[in-house]
């Protein structure tokens, strides 16, 4: 009876006839992880280039508030061809997909550097460059679990996923640091060196940053072109050697899996809102008289803290397997409390909570620590829940939905720019909702079962 409801692909045995060769790991896996992580770092750095220096960018290039919002919005818009990249990864492998991604980033970074005197044309080129960089987002966000399964042993997978996925966030964090320190604010000396805040001086510094980013991205592209294997000679685990469902079957299975959809919403809503929120943190903190540099430091440490916690939690998950849901419950409890604290701080006249630099720093950094720390754990849980659906397809659906929520938030931002406290309430409410979804979720570890018991 069950055969009537399954596709031919689903009726194939997971393991190839005769069994897979004995699993083995190769030292080159760390080089592959390094190249991919650096690429992900640079994509995040370029995506978040403009938010932290939005005041200087308005002066140098006559950007409007709508322009600044659009420069951030190109990130989620770049996820529209997400399903194409998922298909490419599933059918052509990691090398072709990563090469195409790196090429898009080179073209995007180069487009921003075209020396045109007309500011209107220059703004169009910058927008185009940001869009091309956005098209690289699906790969750098989705491929981490695929890479870790392809190259790493079961007791290293969560750690590799954490490193590969967190470096993209770290790149976005470094944009909060690099931009405000290198690019001076108008009529100030807040840059890396004492420097006149004139329009020409600001423009020169912004262009220096863009040229440097282009050069580094080109070097990474050349390194990937020279050496980035699609897979190791021998799979590192039983799961890596097993058959996977086809692209079409995987999509249907994902959309009909209620447990998967529940945990997807638990990830997509708060992480999507947080990505949009942190991208315009400078605008949110402006009404409470936080400078561009201070806002940059807040954003930087909030994401860096999340990256450190994410990698540490990933290592812990590798050491003690089967505890992904409790980890998520703990992290989201902290995120919910921190977001509530940050939001109520802006209502100090009502709540009487102190509105100081220390409270803003602490609450904002804790939000980033707890939310960003959940990303690699979510990715591992997605793959475990829907195995044997390919990792790239499962995570592609997830990040696509996350960017839809991020895009919706930024679209509303383009219409309601005067008063931004509603962004804080959206973030807090999404954390509460996600905590409820995680509590209702029933976890399973199908891929882990295959590796532990079948290999034995």
UniProtKB/Swiss-Prot annotation:
The keyword Iron-sulfur does not apply. Residues 51-67, 117-123, 184-207, 281-292, 348-362, 414-420 are lumenal. One of its GO terms (biological process) is pyridoxine transport. GO terms for molecular function: transmembrane transporter activity. The chain crosses the membrane at residues 30-50, 68-88, 96-116, 124-144, 163-183, 208-228, 260-280, 293-313, 327-347, 363-383, 393-413, 421-441. It is found in: Lysosome membrane. It catalyses: pyridoxine(out) + n H(+)(out) = pyridoxine(in) + n H(+)(in). Residues 1-29, 89-95, 145-162, 229-259, 314-326, 384-392, 442-456 are cytoplasmic. Keywords: Glycoprotein, Lysosome, Membrane, Transmembrane, Transmembrane helix, Transport. Pfam families: MFS_1. InterPro entries: FLVCR1-2_SLC49-like, MFS, MFS_trans_sf, SLC49A4-like. It is a multi-pass membrane protein. A motif (Di-leucine motif) lies at residues 14-15. GO terms for cellular component: intracellular membrane-bounded organelle; lysosomal membrane; membrane. Mediates H(+)-dependent pyridoxine transport. Belongs to the major facilitator superfamily. This is Solute carrier family 49 member 4 homolog. The lineage of its organism: Eukaryota, Metazoa, Chordata, Craniata, Vertebrata.
